[in-house]
C-alpha cells in the first residue's frame, strides 16, 4: 500500500534541528590531516518526495519495549554458540555482534543470571543459605498446611522478606534470590511444595493452599494488605494501540546541503596554508526499509532503519521481498560510489557492501576550493569522498537497528 506525503510542510525549524545533529556528528568524526573542521551551514529538503510503501504491520519488537536508560552507554558483545564472549572468544567462526541488552536477556533466560548458581529450580524457589529464627511458629504452621512460609519477623517489613520489587514480567520478584526455607528434621521433613507456574504469583499459591482448611482465618488473610487494593483496581483502558509499521522507502532526492571546511597544507610546517572549501550535497539516492513502532500506553514512537541482511532484526522472520524491476533499473543508473583504487571484480564471490553504501548508493556533491572572487578549484575527489563516507557512517551509527531514536509525545 502506497503512502502519500505532504513534503511541502517540512519547515525550516526541522531543517535547523537536522543541521545541529549533523554538526555534532561531524565534530566527533575523525578527519585526515589535510581537512579542517567541517560544518553544515544550510539544508533544504527539496521538492522530490520519497516513494513510501507499507510492507508490514505487526506487534512491537521486544527491544523497543525495554527501558534502556541504564544501558545507553553499553556496547555490543560478541555471542558465539549461545555463549557470551565479551572479552574475545576462542572461536571467531559463526559469531555475531548483538546489543548487550539482548545478550543479557538470553543469558538470564538460560539460568545464568541472579539466583542461577547452577540450580534448575524455578526462580521463586531458589534460596540462599538457611537461617533459623525464634519465630519458627510461622514456618511450623505452614508445614501443617502442606506449604512453606518465610522465616523472620522482617517478612512484614520487606527487609529480607518474600517480595522485594515488581519484576518486568508483572509478578513479584523474590528478594535475595527466593524465600527462606526452614531446616528439615526427622520429625518435620520438607512437605510437598505446591509450586505455582511462572505465570502466577506466589500469593495465588498461598490462597490455593488455604482451600485445604476453610476454617483457617490466618491463611485467608492477604499476605500484603497494603497491596491488595491495588490488585483489585481495574486497569485503565488504553485507547492507543501498540503497533509497528514497516515502510519501504525509495527516494531520489534533490535536497541541498551546504558544507564548509578547509584544505590544510602542512608543508613546510603544520597548517602552513589553509584553503577554504565549500561543498554542496545536491542530491542522494536512498533505498531501505524503515521501522516505526508506536507505544500507545507510554506515548512513544521508535524509529530505525532495518538492514535487509540482518536475520535477527525486527523483520528477520519475514520472507524476503521481491525486488522491484524499476528499482533495479534506478540502481543501475546511479551505481554506488566506488573507490578508484579498488581492484576489479575477479569473479570470486564478493562480500556484501556496507549497510551505509546499500542504503545510500549515490550521493552527489559539488565542491569549490578557494575564494569566490579569486581562482577556484572545483570537484575535488578526495574531499568529496570523505564527506560521502561521513554521511553514510552517520546514518549507520544513528539509525540502523539496533540503533534507534525514540520520540516522546505529549499527552494532548
From Swiss-Prot:
Signal peptide: none annotated. Residues 66-96, 108-136, 166-238, 314-354 are annotated as: Disordered. GO terms for cellular component: endoplasmic reticulum membrane; ERMES complex. It is found in: Mitochondrion outer membrane; Endoplasmic reticulum membrane. Residues 220-238 have a biased composition (Low complexity). InterPro entries: Mdm12, MMM1_dom, SMP_LBD. Its main location: mitochondrion. One of its GO terms (molecular function) is lipid binding. Keywords: Endoplasmic reticulum, Lipid transport, Lipid-binding, Membrane, Mitochondrion, Mitochondrion outer membrane, Transport. It is a peripheral membrane protein. The SMP-LTD domain is a barrel-like domain that can bind various types of glycerophospholipids in its interior and mediate their transfer between two adjacent bilayers. Component of the ERMES/MDM complex, which serves as a molecular tether to connect the endoplasmic reticulum (ER) and mitochondria. Components of this complex are involved in the control of mitochondrial shape and protein biogenesis, and function in nonvesicular lipid trafficking between the ER and mitochondria. MDM12 is required for the interaction of the ER-resident membrane protein MMM1 and the outer mitochondrial membrane-resident beta-barrel protein MDM10. Component of the ER-mitochondria encounter structure (ERMES) or MDM complex, composed of MMM1, MDM10, MDM12 and MDM34. A MMM1 homodimer associates with one molecule of MDM12 on each side in a pairwise head-to-tail manner, and the SMP-LTD domains of MMM1 and MDM12 generate a continuous hydrophobic tunnel for phospholipid trafficking. PANTHER family: MITOCHONDRIAL DISTRIBUTION AND MORPHOLOGY PROTEIN 12. This is Mitochondrial distribution and morphology protein 12. It comes from Coprinopsis cinerea (strain Okayama-7 / 130 / ATCC MYA-4618 / FGSC 9003) (Inky cap fungus).
